[in-house]
Amino acid sequence: MLEATERVKEDARAIISQIQNNGYVNPAIKPTDNKLTVIIPFLNEGEEVGRTVCSIRETVGNKVDIIVINDCSTDGYPYQKDLLPLNVYYIVNSKRQGVAASRDMGIGLSKTPYFLLLDGHMRFYDSQWCEYIVNLLTENDRRLLCTQGRYLEKVDGVVREIASRTYKSYGAYMPLIKGHTLTEIVWKGNEYAPEADTEPIPVVLGAGYAASKRYWNHLRGLEGLRYYGNDEAYISMKVWMEGGECVLLKKVVVGHIYRKKSPYKRYSADELFNELLISYLLFPQSLWCVEFATLCKTNRDLFLMALEKFQEESKRWVALREYYRRNFTKTFRDFTEVQQRLCSQFLEDFKKKDIDVKGIAQFVSEKPLEEKGLFDGTMGQILWLCIYENSSEDHTYKDHIKALWDGVAAAVHHKKFPCNFSNGLAGIGWGLIFLKEHNMIEDDISEELNLIDRQLSCYAIQKDKDLSLATGTGGILAYATARKMYGIKNHIPAEWIDDNEEMLMKAAQMVIDESSELNALVYAMRYIALCRDGYDEQDYPINLGDWMDVKDFIPKNPRRWTSVLTDTTLTTSTLYLIYHKKLNRHGKIQ
């Protein structure tokens, strides 16, 4: 009842505001000789809208067209009065559309080949910025340009630089940290090309973005986003995946007044919807399932509301995803390579680490484990030693690895294992597929997988109340997902999976409905997506990071080391070995 009352009040304020701001829904925008249109959507900005436009006119005069879009403000401020003498096209949305839709609308209405998107609280400082932007886009219009920000605040009506903001930023990037929202972006602190006036950046941020109308339409703009949130991540990834580039203009400095509070509702089902949509459209299958699972774990009620909205237009999103796959020349994996190249903070820390991986390898080889499984047994040691060998090209332990595997294989043949993932058949099977997928073993593994399948066929998954990855349904689904993917890619049928697909699907849905464990949720969603949508050719091979918690600590005293895969010594050194290989490839360390 309270929410309904608030909606009525909001609608009333919107009607009053529209009466006070008699703009146009579809104004007739006349072509000019200008090359650039500035587009400013806003909501409840007060005097700042007019001051932003004044700053534009004071620096470049009438060299740009300006479209100002009032997204159904409710503050009663007389915007039209401020804007009337400033030669702008002023539009009032009769219903709130949100930032993304308002930006796309403004671009659609513009008559110039290029445009600049701004917020309604910005300042300009020189008279060359328009010509500079136009020249860069004329030279190459497969670009999204980002202005350099000056961080401002407004205190008692006075606009000033934020004194505490002493560091510079150079665009943004996506950390892509499991357990966090994968579409989240953060400021990038390192400068990639200090000697240049421009430099490529992974993601634009700061609310000053320029592009060509032709290219924006080819990318389908911000299509699908609701109200507020994630514009920058969405459009930046699309630019890089299409084959274009995001570029920071260090010479074009634009002041941005950072507000204490957003006028748009934050952390709503609509914002979660945007995160679901972007991940589904642009991420490979395994990663969008991680994003869905993370949002489900974080706030299940809000996730279910967002998911319902998403599923209402599922056919539209499938078609849009297919459009991107047809028209983009790069993949999400290529985008992450761009990030690693441009963001030294991703990899430079590993330069400074002094991890005795040779010593750890010797330690592991000398510490046999009684258990045979993946988490704290021999299979985990085999995986670590194979990763070490693959990264370091040190083949000292080749015979030792074979001997370890012979012991595990013998135990599998003698049916001495539980079915679970942590210390049983599911984990051993997953480990075998991992080694084969990453070309760390040459032997055919079909016999071992078929044997594991036959033993797992006796497991009553639908009766198991344990939904966890380690010892329950989540772990069986982890193996089933890897097994099905391996079978599809290598044209090898997985009869246990095919014969029990309905039962496994029901088990996966039970995990989604009842579990709060991230890894279990991820594999439940991955299994359902794989069965429903098929294998994604752009997906990653299975990896330890799919389920292993990343740690960054190794005891200095070797007496405190352990040879268990899931303990800090091996998880940290595994991360180091993987990134050491990437650092070498990017020329960062030798």
Residue map of PLM features:
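Terminal low-complexity segments of carbohydrate-biosynthetic enzymes
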Residues: 1-17, 48, 205-206, 267-346
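A recurrent flexible, glycine/aromatic-enriched loop bordering the glycosyltransferase active site
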Residues: 100, 182-210, 269-270
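Short aromatic/hydrophobic "clamp" motif used to bind/position activated sugar donors
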Residues: 115
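Short, acidic, metal-binding catalytic loop of nucleotide-sugar glycosyltransferases
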Residues: 54-63
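Conserved donor NDP-sugar-binding/catalytic core segment of glycosyltransferases
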Residues: 123, 127-179
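Glycine-rich, basic loop-to-helix element that forms the pyrophosphate-binding segment
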Residues: 78, 94-109
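A conserved acidic beta->alpha catalytic loop
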Residues: 70-79, 123
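N-proximal low-complexity "stem/linker" segments adjacent to membrane-targeting elements
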Residues: 1-55
